Amino acid sequence: FSTTGFGLQASTTFNVTKKWQVFGQFNYGKGIGSYLNDLSNLNVDIVPDPDNEGKMQVLPMLGWYAGLQYNICPNIFVSGTYSLSRLYSENNYPSDNPEAYRKGQYFVANAFWNVTSNMQVGVEYLRGWRTDFNFSPRHANRLNMLVQYSF
């Protein structure tokens, strides 16, 4: 007996106008946790099958994001993105552990300025939410700043 994972992925980016861009990505599959940001460190690609002792199973999971970018001028832009990652239970795994990760969401807004062709500065705010299988919510906020110089 063996089990097989699979994954589907679609992504896009397109210009709505000269200044507005839309971008996004969608992923769905079984055993694709290493390809999804929130799930990549949870070791859920292949897990025990509680209904079949000594056997393994692959769990269904989903991840997507969508964003919008506005180019203020050729060297300054702002953007916002919403993302969701979701782990589904199969054969009561991992839902039999009420504190196991169920889904995560985040919203991020940022601004970047390409000061020169070699130097970029930016600022970003991120708000993240996590919900476990017991529906217990958690959240966190983060502020990032960047100064990058390429030699």
Regions found by a protein language model. Name each.
Residues 1-97, 101:
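Detector for outer-membrane/organellar transmembrane beta-barrel domains
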Residues 21, 77, 120, 140-144:
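Outer-membrane beta-barrel architecture
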Residues 104-106:
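A short, acidic, amphipathic alpha-helical segment used as a generic capping/interface helix at domain edges
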Residues 101, 132-137:
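Solvent-exposed loop/turn segments connecting transmembrane beta-strands
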Residues 24, 66, 80, 109-111, ...:
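Membrane-embedded beta-strand positions of outer-membrane beta-barrel proteins
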Residues 113-115, 139-151:
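Outer-membrane beta-barrel "beta-signal"
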